[in-house]
């Protein structure tokens, strides 16, 4: 019997990383994206990691949602190509960067955003928590508090950026911004409902939910 070394179409490389500087992860994403633009048959990728404290602004983000002067700031801040307003990353927040070829899934950005929300909702359900979507907003809420932010960039139907789930972060950094430009809804973290929860245990459930929602077989790399 002749066996093919070609991976199945629904395989997805999983990179489980620890704490990674934002710009390093951003450059890595861009490299993976451009590889897949040039070679569309390459496998999908999911990167899971945490970042040191950093603020990021979407390409059209307004500076009015910063409560500090970005030109005279001790805080790391970057404007990037994703959609959405300002957000905050820090240890204790689990960040997922899917690099997916949507031609293999569905060429529909609204569908993709809802699928990312569904991943988070399924993770929360593992803990008996009901994650909510809100009309006209992107992300996932728990009892009125936003626990997951989502922002994406898609080039030639290849995705980058992704989701950030507040597991057990120090929430202080969120107080320096209006997260995602939403003035009337607070942010929250899973630790407020589940004391002692860690990113390490949540990773397992994120991987399982991501595989189920997107119909992928994740292979740790």
From Swiss-Prot:
The annotated site for Lowers pKa of active site Cys falls at: 146
Q: Which Gene3D superfamilies match?
A: Bira Bifunctional Protein, Domain 2
Q: Can you say where in the cell this protein is located?
A: Cytoplasm
The answer, when asked if S-adenosyl-L-methionine is one of the entry's keywords, is no
Q: Quote the pathway field.
A: Protein modification; protein lipoylation via endogenous pathway; protein N(6)-(lipoyl)lysine from octanoyl-[acyl-carrier-protein]: step 1/2
The free-text function statement in the UniProt record for this protein reads: Catalyzes the transfer of endogenously produced octanoic acid from octanoyl-acyl-carrier-protein onto the lipoyl domains of lipoate-dependent enzymes. Lipoyl-ACP can also act as a substrate although octanoyl-ACP is likely to be the physiological substrate.
The note filed under miscellaneous reads: In the reaction, the free carboxyl group of octanoic acid is attached via an amide linkage to the epsilon-amino group of a specific lysine residue of lipoyl domains of lipoate-dependent enzymes.
Protein name as it appears in the record: Octanoyltransferase
| Source organism per UniProt | Trichormus variabilis (strain ATCC 29413 / PCC 7937)
């Amino acid at each position: 019997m002749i066996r093919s070394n070609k991976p199945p179409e629904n395989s997805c490389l999983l990179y489980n990383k620890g704490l990674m500087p934002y710009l390093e992860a951003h450059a890595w994403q861009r490299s993976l994206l451009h590889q897949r633009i040039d070679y569309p048959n390459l496998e999908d990728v999911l990167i899971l990691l945490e970042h040191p404290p950093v603020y990021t602004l979407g390409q059209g983000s307004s500076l009015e949602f910063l409560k500090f002067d970005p030109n005279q700031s001790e805080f790391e801040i970057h404007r990037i190509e994703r959609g959405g307003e300002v957000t905050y990353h820090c240890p204790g927040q689990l960040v997922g960067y899917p690099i997916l070829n949507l031609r293999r899934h569905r060429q529909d950005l609204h569908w993709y955003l809802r699928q990312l929300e569904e991943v988070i909702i399924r993770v929360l359900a593992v803990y008996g928590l009901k994650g909510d979507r809100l009309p006209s907003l992107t992300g996932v809420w728990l009892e009125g508090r936003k626990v997951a932010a989502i922002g994406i960039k898609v080039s030639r139907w290849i995705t980058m950026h992704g989701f950030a789930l507040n597991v057990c972060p120090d929430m202080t950094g969120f107080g320096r911004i209006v997260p995602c430009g939403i003035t009337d809804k607070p942010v929250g973290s899973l630790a407020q409902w589940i004391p002692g929860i860690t990113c390490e245990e949540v990773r397992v459930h994120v991987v399982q939910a991501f595989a189920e929602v997107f119909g992928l077989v994740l292979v740790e790399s």
